[in-house]
A protein has these predicted regions:
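An aromatic- and glycine-enriched ligand-binding surface/loop that stacks and positions planar moieties
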Residues: 3, 12, 28-35, 40-143
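Conserved, well-structured interaction surfaces
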Residues: 1-4, 8-24
């Protein structure tokens, strides 16, 4: 019942966005974003129902396929980003999101204080692990 209502809401959003906002905007929810979410919800619910012996899984998997096809075949849609031999690397190292393949992005910007903490985690003295450093242990042993 709940997943049926979620799909109903997504279908409603698709209809609303179809009339108003079918342009590709990386940092806003658009018709494309709702189609992608419908695809993910359909895939998750369909496979969950299939492999847990629940009925009605084909409906959700078909919703996933139709939403995915819309994204890949609709005019002005998405495709795999290709920029030569380093396409995958270039897609993720770019300063700005690339709208050929990315449907929804977040713009990290120091000026607006929109940052992430990936490097803070990796560069911490314990590298994300709990415990004391070897240097501290050695200092305690010597004392």
């Amino acid at each position: 019942f709940v997943m049926g209502k979620i799909m109903e809401d997504l279908n409603f959003a698709i209809e609303v966005f179809k009339e108003t906002n079918r342009t590709k905007e990386l940092y806003r929810v658009t018709w494309w974003t709702v189609q992608a979410l419908k695809s993910r919800v359909g895939l998750f619910e369909g496979t969950y129902r299939k492999y847990h012996g629940l009925g009605d899984y084909e409906k959700y998997l078909n919703d996933c396929v139709s939403a995915s096809n819309e994204i890949m075949t609709a005019s002005g849609g998405y495709s795999l980003y290709q920029s030569g031999s380093q396409s995958y690397r270039n897609l993720f190292k770019s300063e700005n999101a690339i709208d050929a393949e990315i449907i929804l992005a977040r713009d990290y910007n120091n000026d607006l204080s929109l940052v992430h903490k990936v490097q803070a985690f990796e560069n911490s003295p314990t590298l994300g692990r709990t415990g004391v450093s070897k240097k501290l242990v050695n200092n305690g042993i010597q004392g």
